[in-house]
UniProtKB/Swiss-Prot annotation:
The lineage of its organism: Bacteria, Bacillati, Cyanobacteriota, Cyanophyceae, Synechococcales. The gene is leuS. This is Leucine--tRNA ligase. GO terms for biological process: leucyl-tRNA aminoacylation. It comes from Prochlorococcus marinus (strain SARG / CCMP1375 / SS120). The keyword Cytoplasm applies. It catalyses: tRNA(Leu) + L-leucine + ATP = L-leucyl-tRNA(Leu) + AMP + diphosphate. PANTHER family: LEUCINE--TRNA LIGASE, MITOCHONDRIAL, LEUCYL-TRNA SYNTHETASE.
Amino acid sequence: MASKISQTPEKQPSTAYDPLSIETRWQQSWKEQGLYKTKEPTKSQKTFYALSMFPYPSGTLHMGHVRNYVITDVIARLHRMKGDSVLHPMGWDAFGLPAENAAIERGIPADIWTYKNIEDMRNQLNRLGLSIDWDKEVTTCKEEYYKWTQYIFLELYEAGLAYQKSATVNWDPIDKTVLANEQVDANGRSWRSGALVEKKKLKQWFLKITDFADELLEDIELLSGWPQNVKTMQQNWIGRSNGTEIDFYIKGKNNIFITVFTTRPDTLHGTEYLVLAPDHELINSIIDKNKITELEQFRTEISILTDQERTSDGNNKRGMFLGCHAINPINKKIIPIWVGEYVLSSYATGAVMGVPAHDKRDYKFAKKYSLPIQYVIKSPSQEASDLEASSAYVKEGIMINSGEFNGINSKEAGFMITKLGVKQGWAKNKVTYKLRDWLISRQRMWGCPIPIIYCPDCGSVPVKREELPVKLTNPSVIGKSQENKNNIPIMKCSKCNKDSILETDTMDTFMCSSWYFLRYIDVENNKLPFTKTEVDKWLPVDQYVGGIEHAILHLLYSRFLIKALRNRGLLNIKEPFSNLLTQGMVQGVTFKNPKTSKYISPDHINDINTPLDPETGEPLDVLYEKMSKSKYNGVDPASVIDKYGTDTARMFILFKAPPEKDLEWDESDVEGQYRFLNRLWRIVIYSIETKDINISNCTQEILLNDLSDKERKLIKVLNNTIKEVTNDLVNDFQFNTAISELMILCNSIYENIDDCGDYIVTETFKKLTLLLAPFAPHIAEEFWIKLKGKGSVHENSWPTYDPKALLEDSYKLIIQINGKVRGNISVNHEDSELELKNKALACETTQKWLNGIEPKRIIIVKGKIINIVF
């Protein structure tokens, strides 16, 4: 029988679903109640720290923000209902290039621009119905925050982890600042401005992240709650290589040698040349003087290339013979020394041995410059005479052309050659890393000042802690750092009290964001950035949610900082984030001309189903791509909320795709979630108006034997929904399948409600509302109050399921006679032991075997067997 509510249009609730009215009212109520303020945990209570990566305050939320924050909010709400003391804070990553550039473009001071954007975005976030504790808010550009960033810098400085040196750095010519290696993409462009990065020699501040390379690598094993791809990215970025350093002495230069690092000492006999980085420190000492002009020209040509361009496999690499030679230590062969664009001074020793027979890049280089190619390893199935110089053999094999090592497996030979070199003094075992120290100097004004002064007598001197914060020179400045530093700030030297110049560079904004999660837990502390007690209570973060683009930036820096601060005795934890969820992108539909690569606004397309370029009439490609203004595929969250309501927007974001996958925006699916909530509204509110429903009276146990078939069916679906939704949220974060389960429950309510008693309906609505609360908090709160629930739905306990309700009505009970199986009977789960005995004794099989004999014993294993002994 179909539900009367769905069957008869006149039986509709007296009030229609009005999401904007409901959501505005409840958001104001939650704020006034302080509902989401972090509560001090009791002795028996678990803590749960739910954290989204905090945003740069651009002024406008986009759908990527919405997805991130809603995912975290569902997790926070679930754990609050499960009885945990939950910390769910929010803040602002407010320093940096975008704010300064936006201020320049608009003629607005950076601080005014930033604080206005924060206010706007806070209001937008509040419309999402997030359970954020705003009392914990942090803003990195405020003195009360960056004072402690400077404090942490001084801790690193005192530990010898912050130092200054002249270095060739990545220079962004548009933003006019230095970039860390991690901030340059694979195409050699700035991750912010998109400019091709240049090389400059500047004096810069660095942090010794390399001191923690092994620990950062080894402790990845502790991160069982992180996605494997993120862990792999960090492992590759750290790039540990176990190998050998080999010294090649220079012919005709007493006691001058070039050290190379190799992971393939087995190929040493095949070394035909050495290649040095263009800025290798020994070049000027060994070069043929007639080659100096040519070298300078070569260096000029190379200087315009990025490291990525120099080391990529895409093209034949340029080189230049230096007019000098080295001596191969293992066979005394004289080999030429070259300089090559593909060798970087920043990696290992800045010199490599050229083994063209066994390295693809060396092979291309040798072919280009007609250098000899000598094979020293062959495949076990190949004859040495069959080898041709047509490609590099890069696998393991059998040694050839290698003197005493001929015939030995190449891997074993590598160990033997290293051992020989160590014994003779020209080799040693060595571990190297791709990881480089973290360059934190930025030539900008809108950033955290570095607390260092330059005294004419004492040199570099750290500012005293009691003098922190070193304030921004002029927080309302408009313009770029180096162009506006007309008034260099002066401070007294803490050692000799002389007037000294304050460091004018500011810190990389990742310095501010590498510890912000620590400040949330102790935000009112004006004596320390945080205390050990609070860190022990709340850290590590239980669930961190953010984009995978931060895998080797923020996430690696945060791990480093935690380890450095642990060594300083400031905290006890080893890792900052126990579990990490990297949500996929939100993609919108784009219309692109495949010939011109030009994106066309949908407003300029006459027929969306058959899209054509309005200028050329050419067919357009229809694609889903990351939302962007330039691609005309962005969707304003505010417009969606205005049209459908916050709960609908949340439900769509959670339902459309698993959280780790990309989400394709489709307004028809948004409408589908609106229809679902509207349907729930009609059934719940109409039932409240026509039935005796008061969930405060739901105190008695539901006896399954007393239920009608329809009631039993509904209760079974309800309990299965509780089980599945809980599993989806707690174990897998499969929000989409959890919402599907709620839809199944809704359908079951429609099918069965007219034949169910008020108490069953009340129990169903109570648990449905609790299950709905993390996903659609406003409509759930409205249901809860109308159902006469106590307090807020969000302060009530998460429901648990009754396993008995999931069982089939009957099951087969095996009958044993004197321990042997003789048959089975159909019984009900609710049958008592007496009822089971009577049914077993009454069945034909039992009577046949007993043949009138009275049983001595009857043993029952409920749900399985009954054993009758006579």
